Amino acid sequence: MSHVRKQIRDYLLSTITGLSTTGAKAFASRVYPLDSGKLPAVIVYTLSEDSVESAFSKRREQDRQLDAIVEGYVRALNTFDDTLDQIASEVEAAILADTTLGGLVKNVELTGTDTDYAGDSEQPVGTVRLTFRIQYRTVTGSPNSAI
């Protein structure tokens, strides 16, 4: 079994694949750039995670808070702001429809949304970045199983 972080990314990717605006163009990597033929698209990845030993448990457990990012990308046309808002709306509704991610985590909350525009390539690109704070728990030393 994989680390709970990977399980969370996989769950999020499954949740955002097939949205109305981006369809099957959902990816789990930010390493490779998206060419204009793959836009509009969304990607999901995780950033930082804070872990603390739980003070309220008989066994050693860790309470974890993970920041997961979903980024939407569109070609920057006249209506790119509207399209980015539509992607953000679809992502937010899909992920927050089940704030336990099928029982994998304790809670998910949206903590921020940012938009940006990059006009330095052949095809300008607009982006929206949604940050989700995900709370989950593991037994200390067993990071592959959420409890």
Would you name each region that the model predicts?
Residues 40-44:
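A short glycine-rich, His/Asp/Glu-containing loop-to-beta-strand
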